[in-house]
């Protein structure tokens, strides 16, 4: 059985979710990220999947960071790297017979790129 992995474009999701959109607009990013990660944790537990949530460094400059919070793998990209770039590369790496990769983003260009790599879209 394939391991199901969901890759999430964190700030894209925050900007479009009604529950977090106002926090994003007010630059209350810590609160918005916490809400998103809690929701993703519940979703991961319910679905029995691994979730990797990627945030652009443009909102949190510095070196790439990876850690786990609420049972979700959290990645802040390197300063010159977008979440889209990271997700595209990771989707290609994880697209093996052992994994079923899905991507959650509203970015159409990102969707087409990951479709071409064999990943699925979650909306």
Regions picked out by a protein language model, each given a short descriptive name:
Residues 3-8, 12-123:
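Nuclease catalytic cores that cleave nucleic-acid phosphodiester bonds
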